[in-house]
Amino acid sequence: MKDTAKHQGLRNQLVTTLEQKGITDRAVLDAIKKIPRHLFLNSSFEDFAYQDKAFPIGAGQTISQPYTVAFQSQLLEVKKDHKILEIGTGSGYQTAVLFMLGAKVYTVERQSELFKTTSNLFPKLNIRPKHVTFGDGYKGLPNFAPFDSIIVTAGAPFIPQPLMAQLKIGGRLVIPLGEDVQIMTLLIRKNETQFEKHEFGEFRFVPLLEDKN
């Protein structure tokens, strides 16, 4: 698993692109500068790994474009040792960004193929999430709640109630809401019953899968 000076140069260019697109969080940009995105992709896409594009990763899923990863990560306002729930491990790239930001990451993946691939990949890259689970993201991880923040990396038609319940007071939930096109939505929990809602424009995500059993 090689990471070369050429890859590093391409990552530096990618970070410049993200800055030009409005990403300002230095810690997020530094994480993206360090993480070998090409190792999270099928080798046939390696030459394109540092373009600001999404790519298929199997099981009908995609690795989000770097801008989207940076945008969601910036909205979370991650602090060191924050306990973060990630719904949709996918390729594991977003997980790696959160880990590099110093978060304790609890991540859930619904697709067994991706779950196996990323579970094998993390140790090779020295990425150490606190907990990697195969399961239904709509349910969250109640046994590990509450969380400082929750990030959903797939489009959802509504905000799953269990996720709202598992957020700490003062916590932030970032979720792309909508059917075909999603509105990036931030919820901040004000108290037991009230949430403050902010919306940040249109994005496109694969749908969040619910366990129908």
Swiss-Prot record:
Active-site residue list: 64
Taxonomic superkingdom: Bacteria
Entries under CDD domains matching the protein: AdoMet_MTases
InterPro entries per the UniProt record, alphabetical: PCMT, SAM-dependent_MTases_sf
UniProt xrefs under PROSITE patterns: PCMT
A GO cellular component annotation in the UniProt record: cytoplasm
Transmembrane segments: none
EC number from the UniProt entry: 2.1.1.77
Enzyme class, broadest EC rank: transferase
Signal peptide span: none
Chief location: cytoplasm
Subcellular location: Cytoplasm
UniProt record, GO biological process: methylation; protein modification process; protein repair
Function summary: Catalyzes the methyl esterification of L-isoaspartyl residues in peptides and proteins that result from spontaneous decomposition of normal L-aspartyl and L-asparaginyl residues. It plays a role in the repair and/or degradation of damaged proteins.
Similarity section: Belongs to the methyltransferase superfamily. L-isoaspartyl/D-aspartyl protein methyltransferase family.
Protein name: Protein-L-isoaspartate O-methyltransferase
